[in-house]
């Protein structure tokens, strides 16, 4: 029989589709489906999980609550501290993981004698109870500095050090504040003399490195000498023979290597987010609501949304940083005392006598890949760019940014939503299109990255004083 206007084929097609639908019906009517349709607000108006590829489909928690897509679960897992790789070696520091060096470095870290006024130690600016920051907008030592104190938790996983990356190893960074006039203000000869004149320090040092240049103890030897600092110190330094200067530099570098050995032990610990991620990784849902509340989960969803917030472009991996340098519009072009950021740091690291390729490094040339293949200076995007910090322990590491300009995390996010009209030709920001509620949710999530040991009660009880 001939069809009329294609009606018969149409009816046949409907019958086939109906049969296929019946065959797909679960045998147990009340069994929970593997995936479920989403509310329009979850993935777009009118969308359902059935219309999306499997990796984008959201599974259900017991009770019908929408959870995460496979893609989102992978993103969450990648941020978990469980994914943190093993402590990386430092080929430029042969005693980096020697327990004797760790203890020597710990003692020096907390010792105020390594400052010109004998009142300031490394721990003055790197307080254990504040995740090894100081709570100030800009660090203050002998005088006022121009930058915020970076935290030290997880510092051993970094490639570049200080906000502009002007040091390429943890030990080269460790000796920098010792001689900085506004920080500790001591000369390298005074550092070596302090080690040599203390019986315990001297014994510990010589067990690791051999004999100290004990001529620094002679009454006629210049008391204060080093290439940096005041004119007196610089003049006295130039008066020393080349061989003596080299021996002092070796001892000074060894002090830095010992401090670095201690700082390498400052590894991150899990926060509430990490426990939540662990629960998800094990396929569990029952404890989720006890780990992160509704707003914190919403903030996490925003954080990993590569289209809406793009946070993961810079803050990725278990330390929530790509270890790179970016211009986020915090520079003021043409202002007095402008901070040039990374472009100046590139020049400085090449000139540093303690860099990986220098004679005081323990590394073979082939091991200095970061320095050897570092992009040259003059890159436009390096102007006003600063290192991307870790987001871990944000609750106790404010104020924020390289100059501590933002007192609160909410102020940072507001800056990202409405960047100031400064340096617009250079900064990399695309303003966040977030509501006030979403901004608060994002901030709520970021606070879950703080470790339990830095909570109010633990800090009050003094449970975070590393090694003390």
Regions found by a protein language model. Name each.
Residues 24-26:
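Bacterial signal peptide processing site
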Residues 8-16:
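Sec-dependent signal peptide recognition
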Residues 88-92, 152, 158-209, 241-248, ...:
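Axial heme c-ligation environment in periplasmic c-type cytochrome domains
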């Amino acid at each position: 029989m001939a069809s009329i206007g294609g009606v018969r084929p149409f009816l046949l097609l409907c019958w086939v589709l109906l049969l296929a639908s019946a065959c797909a019906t679960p045998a147990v009517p009340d069994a929970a489906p593997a995936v479920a349709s989403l509310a329009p607000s979850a993935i777009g108006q009118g969308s359902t999980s059935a219309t999306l590829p499997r990796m984008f489909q959201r599974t259900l928690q017991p009770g019908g609550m929408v959870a995460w897509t496979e893609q989102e679960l992978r993103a969450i897992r990648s941020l978990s501290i469980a994914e943190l790789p093993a402590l990386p070696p430092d080929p430029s520091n042969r005693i980096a993981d020697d327990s004797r060096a760790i203890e020597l470095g710990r003692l020096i870290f907390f010792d105020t004698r390594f400052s010109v006024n004998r009142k300031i130690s490394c721990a003055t600016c790197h307080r254990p109870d504040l995740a090894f920051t100081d709570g100030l907008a800009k660090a203050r030592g002998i005088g006022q500095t121009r930058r915020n104190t970076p935290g030290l938790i997880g510092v051993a996983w970094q490639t570049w050090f200080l906000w502009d990356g002007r040091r390429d190893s943890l030990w080269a960074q460790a000796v920098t504040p010792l001689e900085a006039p506004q920080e500790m203000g001591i000369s390298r000869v005074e550092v070596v003399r302090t080690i040599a004149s203390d019986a315990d320090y001297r014994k510990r040092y010589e067990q690791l490195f051999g004999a100290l240049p004990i001529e620094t103890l002679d009454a006629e030897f210049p008391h204060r000498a080093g290439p940096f600092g005041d004119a007196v110190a610089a003049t006295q330094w130039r008066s020393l023979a080349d061989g003596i200067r080299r021996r002092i530099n070796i001892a000074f570098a060894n002090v830095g290597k010992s401090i670095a050995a201690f700082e390498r032990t400052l590894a991150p610990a899990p926060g509430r987010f990490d426990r939540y991620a662990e629960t998800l990784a094990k396929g569990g849902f029952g404890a989720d609501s006890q780990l992160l509340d509704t707003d914190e989960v919403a903030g996490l969803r925003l954080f990993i949304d590569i289209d809406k917030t793009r946070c993961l472009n810079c803050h990725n991996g278990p330390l929530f940083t790509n270890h790179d340098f970016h211009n986020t519009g915090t520079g003021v072009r043409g202002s007095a005392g402008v901070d040039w950021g990374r472009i100046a740091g590139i020049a400085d690291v090449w000139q540093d006598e303690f860099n990986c390729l220098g004679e005081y490094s323990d590394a073979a040339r082939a091991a200095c890949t970061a320095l050897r293949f570092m992009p040259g200076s003059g890159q436009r995007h390096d102007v006003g760019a600063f290192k991307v910090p870790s987001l871990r322990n944000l609750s106790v590491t404010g104020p924020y940014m390289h100059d501590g300009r933002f007192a609160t995390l909410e102020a940072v996010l507001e800056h990202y939503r409405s960047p100031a009209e400064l340096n617009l030709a250079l900064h990399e920001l695309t303003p966040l299109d977030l509501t006030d509620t979403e901004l608060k949710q994002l901030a709520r999530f970021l606070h879950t990255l703080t470790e339990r040991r830095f909570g109010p009660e633990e800090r009050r009880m003094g449970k975070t004083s590393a090694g003390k």
